[in-house]
UniProtKB/Swiss-Prot annotation:
<dbReference type="GO" id="GO:0004350">
    <property type="term" value="F:glutamate-5-semialdehyde dehydrogenase activity"/>
</dbReference>
<dbReference type="GO" id="GO:0005737">
    <property type="term" value="C:cytoplasm"/>
</dbReference>
<dbReference type="InterPro" id="IPR012134">
    <property type="entry name" value="Glu-5-SA_DH"/>
</dbReference>
<dbReference type="InterPro" id="IPR000965">
    <property type="entry name" value="GPR_dom"/>
</dbReference>
<comment type="pathway">
    <text>Amino-acid biosynthesis; L-proline biosynthesis; L-glutamate 5-semialdehyde from L-glutamate: step 2/2.</text>
</comment>
<comment type="similarity">
    <text>Belongs to the gamma-glutamyl phosphate reductase family.</text>
</comment>
<dbReference type="InterPro" id="IPR020593">
    <property type="entry name" value="G-glutamylP_reductase_CS"/>
</dbReference>
<keyword id="KW-0963">Cytoplasm</keyword>
<comment type="function">
    <text>Catalyzes the NADPH-dependent reduction of L-glutamate 5-phosphate into L-glutamate 5-semialdehyde and phosphate. The product spontaneously undergoes cyclization to form 1-pyrroline-5-carboxylate.</text>
</comment>
<keyword id="KW-0560">Oxidoreductase</keyword>
<dbReference type="Pfam" id="PF00171">
    <property type="entry name" value="Aldedh"/>
</dbReference>
<keyword id="KW-0521">NADP</keyword>
<dbReference type="GO" id="GO:0055129">
    <property type="term" value="P:L-proline biosynthetic process"/>
</dbReference>
<dbReference type="InterPro" id="IPR016161">
    <property type="entry name" value="Ald_DH/histidinol_DH"/>
</dbReference>
<protein>
    <recommendedName>
        <fullName>Gamma-glutamyl phosphate reductase</fullName>
        <ecNumber>1.2.1.41</ecNumber>
    </recommendedName>
</protein>
<dbReference type="InterPro" id="IPR016162">
    <property type="entry name" value="Ald_DH_N"/>
</dbReference>
<dbReference type="InterPro" id="IPR016163">
    <property type="entry name" value="Ald_DH_C"/>
</dbReference>
């Protein structure tokens, strides 16, 4: 890590931390007014933003980015409108800052109240998704947190265009200048950013396994780990076939490149003939490459043999691996061994089996008879999300406004001293 780079970022972080302390005191009305102005500014500047994105896409193709990554990188008028709508939805949400979440009276007459407060200055590291820039700025602003954004080099023009537009709109409405900063896209910035103690309250990495692993292993700042999604669907012996087909296709085909897409399918041995055959037919028809265990390969010669590395891998592509299991207990043990604690699902008509599954599976979201694709801040009613946390401290699942706050105790007395 270059000392000059660290010192430069340190100055930026010091300035942003001061602005963040001021942001924590900004009333909800001003924050909401700023968010709505930011949404309008995205719509007004859509041509310039799309032009910057075209430059990034051309650079990405020259770099040899996969079609999956190019799809994540690409902005369209529809996606820009979605970003604007997300900012308006965040404006409409209840502000968690200042919320009283508990209180009681001490025997000595003290009034003790627990109140929500912002975390502070947050560093967000992400890869080829320009939409994260708008979501992160919007959520951090509403929750009273400053933000240092470090996007990928492949999206640098898009990220700079979006953040410039949003910062100008926010500051014009009274948001303290300096509390939103877009950092350079160079990889070296990551190493410096994750060591900016004591200025950063938290770092959130959002991207592939290698990025998240690097941040977790090297950060001296607290890290909120957002998850790689090796998500499973288990089709139990009692599963309704048509329901299973709808869920599997939705979870795998709708958007294969996202973290809540299904990557693995477990099928009970008693349903191999009745359920596996039509499920394979559906997957083949949608152009999904199927890999499988020996029993799956023996059942369908079009299935490729899965290696050990497949079972723990997040494909983020039109690929799925299938395992035939002998029992629900085996399915649970398999998922807890190979899963990434993100989203797991069971398709079953047996209530007791569903109860056992939800109790035993260690994941941020566990589904009964529904697609894993619902693990999303918008779908959960959070407006937007910074990411999906797969750890247990301090937040788990979609990270929205409430998850970007902590609490403090306000104790009021009338001269009491401890006896």
């Amino acid at each position: 890590m270059e000392s000059s780079l660290y010192e430069t970022l340190k100055v930026t972080a010091q300035r942003a931390q001061r602005s963040t302390m001021a942001l924590a005191q900004v009333p909800s009305g001003i924050k909401n007014k700023a968010l709505r102005a930011m949404a309008r500014s995205l719509r007004t500047a859509h041509s310039e933003i799309l032009e910057s994105n075209t430059t990034d896409l051309e650079f990405g193709r020259q770099m040899g980015l996969s079609e999956t990554l190019l799809d994540r990188l690409k902005l369209t008028p529809q996606r820009l409108e979605g970003m604007a709508l997300s900012l308006e939805q965040i404006a409409a949400l209840k502000d968690p800052v200042g919320e009283i979440v508990g209180g009681w009276r001490h025997p000595e007459g003290l009034e003790i109240v627990r109140v929500r407060v912002p975390l502070g200055l947050i560093g967000i590291i992400y890869e080829a998704r320009p939409n994260v820039t708008a979501d992160a700025i919007g959520l951090c602003l509403k929750s009273g947190n400053g933000v240092l954004l470090k996007g990928g080099k492949e999206a640098e023009n898009s990220n700079q265009a979006i953040s410039s537009v949003l910062k100008a709109a926010a500051y014009e409405q009274g948001i303290p200048e300096g509390c939103i900063e877009q950092l350079p896209g160079e990889r070296a910035v990551v190493e410096a950013l994750i060591r900016l103690n004591p200025y950063l309250a938290l770092v959130i990495p959002r991207g592939g396994h290698s990025l998240i692993d690097f941040v977790v292993r090297n950060a001296t700042v607290p890290v909120l780990e957002t998850g790689v999604g090796n998500c499973h669907i288990y089709v139990a012996a009692s599963a309704d076939l048509e329901m299973a087909r709808r869920i599997v296709i939705n979870a795998k085909v709708q958007r294969p490149s996202v973290c809540n897409a299904a990557e693995k399918l477990l099928v009970h041995r008693d349903t191999v003939v009745t359920h596996l055959a039509p499920l394979l037919e559906d997957l083949h028809a949608h152009g999904i490459e199927v890999r499988g265990c020996p029993r799956t390969v023996a059942f369908d010669p079009k299935v490729k043999s899965a290696g050990e590395e497949d079972w723990g891998k997040e494909y983020l592509d039109k690929i799925i691996a299938i395992k035939v299991v002998d029992s629900t207990r085996e399915a649970i043990d398999w998922i807890n061994h190979y899963g990434t604690r993100h989203s797991e699902a069971i398709v079953t008509a047996n209530y007791e089996e569903a109860r056992r599954f939800t109790a035993a599976i260690d994941a941020a979201a566990v589904y009964v008879n529904a697609s894993t694709r619902f693990t999303d801040g918008g779908e959960f009613g959070f407006g937007a999300e910074i990411g999906i946390s797969t750890q247990k401290l301090h937040a788990r699942g979609p990270v929205g406004l409430v998850e970007l706050t902590t609490t403090k105790y306000v104790v009021s007395g009338s001269g009491q001293i401890r006896p």
